[in-house]
Amino acid sequence: MGSTKPRTSAQASAPKVQSLPEKTFIIDNGAYTLKAGYAPGFPPPEDLGQALSACSTIPNAIAKTRGNRIYIGAQLNSQVTDWNEMVFRRPVEKGYIVNWEAQKEIWDNAFFDEKTVRSKDLRIESPEDTTLVLTEAPNALPTLQKNADEIVMEEWGFGGYVRFVGPVLNAWNEVQSLFGDPIGQDSSSPISPKQCLLVVDSGYSHTTVTPVYKGQPIQRAIRRLDIGGKHLTNYLKEMVSMRQYNMVDETYIMNEVKEAVCFVSNNFAGDLEQTWQGNRKRGLTDAAEGITVDYVLPDPNTGKKGFMRPHDPLSNAKKRKSILSGGNAEALSEDVLILGNERFTVPEILFTPSDIGMKQAGIPDIILQSLSVLPTGLHPSFLANVLVVGGNTLIPGFLERLESELRQIASAECVVRVRRPHDPIRSTWLGASRLAANRAELRKFAITRQEYQEYGSSWAGRKFSGIL
């Protein structure tokens, strides 16, 4: 009987793992918009405007007009003129992709179909030669994560892939200057994450609090408030529909109204007292008039967009007088919303969810809940580095109110600093682009197509969660 020769080490070793494709495409897959584009090379641009120029914002929706015309994704930015009674179908619900059929249609339209891609900078010509960085909301269900991984790697066949918890990527941004800390990192050295960062992400579907330590989320400390921009818009629709015009079917228009007029009050009880209608009988109208504004609704017949203007309490009387005298036809055709306490009671639910009957704590309290599960020694570092991102943080007064309330409930010895990046909507994408510039760091998190085919989606899920 012949003896079997032992296998050499070269024969026993696994096949050489492929390196990641050089091109890296980033999709911050938000519920309201996609933030997408190719990551720049190393070193990334120091100028913020130049760095963000590679990122495009695309509506993450399929919409149908009252004339039954369909618009997909980027078409909503360029082709729609009449937003009245527009019906939206969104693939993301409560922060997670739950309808991949619709999401695939939007991605195909925005990135893959040569006929519909609006810019060559957004075209993914060869997925097999591209690494995809895809964001997800914290604490996604494993089934939803597996669906995403299988579609990305099996449907499109990307050469490299990594799925990140979105808020975490903000740790790779240059946030030291926001907090007034010295920038100790040389522009030519590899980019590394900030050591301690508490990210408050208030977007379309929800608000999350994510403590990030050395580039990794502390999972047990992540907290979520089920209120986002969608809920603010719906609340405003209800209030206006009860008090003035029926705007229940005008989601887009009321979202525009919300962005134009709402603010977070630093003296809620005082502002509410000022705008109380009973004050008119007592002659206390001056302060209320400073809060109350008019919003002229858009006119699809003339193409005129909606806009805010100071409230004129005599406008109705002037309008009646103009009708009698045959006055300006354009002014007579205006539909105007008069907005007083609606301006600040709507965003107030981010801080006091009980106002609408929700049994959840507001943003300042869930930040303290998040820190309560961490070692006490870390509390000062996180409270001194609170970064707010997401569209809701652009509401005037949000930053000041959050910092004020945190100071009131935090330990007296802790310094509280709350900062917002220059562009809180695209900040997560920017962080991903800076991480992608550090190829060695990206390789720690990402997988290649060869690895996915060899080990499968379950292994990929463990890799992305940091278990491997």
UniProtKB/Swiss-Prot annotation:
GO cellular component: cytoplasm; cytoskeleton; Swr1 complex
Entry GO MF terms: nucleosome binding
This protein's record includes keyword Cytoplasm: yes
Major site of localization recorded for this protein: cytoplasm
Alphabetical list of CDD domains matching this protein: ASKHA_NBD_Arp6
Compartment annotation: Cytoplasm; Cytoplasm, Cytoskeleton; Nucleus
Name the UniProt record assigns to this protein: Actin-like protein arp6
Organism: Aspergillus fumigatus (strain ATCC MYA-4609 / CBS 101355 / FGSC A1100 / Af293)
UniProt gene name: arp6
